[in-house]
A protein has these predicted regions:
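Patatin-like phospholipase
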Residues: 1-40, 48-283
Length: 283
């Protein structure tokens, strides 16, 4: 008797997405099969490494040893991020940039970095079915990548708008998939999953909103939260109890806390253990 196909949707949320390491590790240890992995942003990074056969313990160790904020050019705080974006905008008012015509050095470096976690493989080389969600900067469309080099697809999904330039994949310029689909459970469903484990690592709404920057950040968070809620409700209508939504308790870990790998991974482990019996009963 064949079992239902199991898919996992790993959401975006910056450093909070390190929780995916813990979730995947427990599922692996407990023998829960994953037939399909779909990732957005950090979910694409961790999901890609998993699909490429990277040992999760080694992945956690390597990520913990790196200063990813510096390596990826990502600020350590929201205030610094705004300053970085403002500085780039001011600079390009006078100098311009030809990123559409010529790939920038930073883009090449980003792809090379992610090749370390994808072992230089292509989607076609993977034993586990894998898909990456990105957004087309020109059309605003969701783009689901399932072929070609893994490193470029992952880089496209994980680019931070304003910090990194859009990445060309085929004839499209792509950016962070979290803009359009933060928890891609619907993509997993479309690709054939009959049971979907959705891992939502989105940051909560800010408790205090005082500055203009706070207002902008909060508005974006509200919009993303509502879009995620609607998408998950639609998947729930199709799957019922076969949609399992995890929301790890990631207090104290912000989207920019790229040095909190192990802390986030442990929280992911704790969250998935609450649902193991439910998931196994569905198989």
């Amino acid at each position: 008797m064949s079992r239902p196909k199991v898919g996992i949707a790993l959401g975006g949320g910056g450093a909070r997405g390190y929780a995916h390491i813990g979730v995947l590790r427990v599922l692996q240890e407990e023998g829960v099969p994953l037939d399909l992995v779909v990732g957005t942003s950090m979910g694409a990074i961790i999901g890609g490494a998993y699909a490429a056969g990277i040992d999760l313990a080694k992945l956690e160790k390597v990520l913990s040893s790196l200063d990813l904020n510096r390596l990826l050019g990502i600020p350590y705080s929201t205030f610094q991020e705004v300053g970085t974006v403002a500085g780039r905008i001011a600079s390009e008012l006078f100098t311009g940039t030809d990123w559409r015509e010529r790939e920038q050095e930073g883009t090449r470096a980003l792809c090379q970095f992610f090749s370390l976690f994808s072992r230089g493989l292509k989607f076609e080389d993977l034993k586990v079915k894998f898909a990456v969600v990105a957004a087309d900067i020109d059309s605003g469309e969701e783009v689901v990548l399932r072929e070609g080099p893994l490193d470029r697809a992952i880089a496209a999904s994980a680019t931070v708008p304003g910090i990194h330039y859009p990445i060309r994949v085929g004839d499209r310029f792509l950016v962070d998939g979290g803009i359009i689909n933060r928890v891609p459970a619907d993509v997993a469903l479309r690709l054939g999953a009959e049971i979907v484990i959705a891992v939502d690592v989105s940051a909560p709404l800010a408790a205090e909103v005082t500055s203009s920057i706070d207002v902008l950040t909060q508005v974006e968070a509200i919009t993303a939260r509502e879009l995620t809620r609607v998408k998950l409700e639609r998947v729930r209508e199709r799957l019922g109890e076969r949609l399992v939504v995890l929301r790890p308790k990631l207090d104290g870990i912000s989207m920019l806390s790229l040095d909190r790998v192990s802390a986030a991974a442990r929280k992911g482990e704790r969250e998935i253990r609450k649902y193991l019996a439910q998931i196994k009963a569905l198989l």
